[in-house]
Amino acid sequence: MKRYLRWIVAAEFLFAAGNLHAVEVEVPGLLTDHTVSSIGHDFYRAFSDKWESDYTGNLTINERPSARWGSWITITVNQDVIFQTFLFPLKRDFEKTVVFALIQTEEALNRRQINQALLSTGDLAHDEF
């Protein structure tokens, strides 16, 4: 009888475990780093330290470095470029560039949200309007 009860309890646990589904956790507002040089990493750190926004989408900071001229920094949201700048290796006006990038990115995100709300083009693909 005890053996029979153990089998029933074990079967109950297996059926209960089979009905459980993992809950997918979404982390809103990620800021990802796709930089490769030291100036790019410094820009990402300075930008992310000062970034205080309630934006729930994901931002990506990309870099195309040049050994001679510096780095081309691009900030994108869902593959849409919202800010671009050129950074010199000597960090000339570095803090001003970071603050300017923060202001321009925030304005671009606000404009983007307004455009999405006003241009309700749900039946069109992104490249059709």
UniProtKB/Swiss-Prot annotation:
UniProt superkingdom: Bacteria
GO MF terms, alphabetically ordered: identical protein binding
One term under GO cellular component: cell outer membrane
A single BP term in Gene Ontology: protein transmembrane transport
Keywords: Signal
Signal peptide: 1-22
InterPro entries linked to this entry: Curli_CsgE
Biological function: May be involved in the biogenesis of curli organelles.
Cross-referenced NCBIfam families: PRK10386.1 (NF007701)
Descriptive protein name: Curli production assembly/transport component CsgE
Gene assigned in the entry: csgE
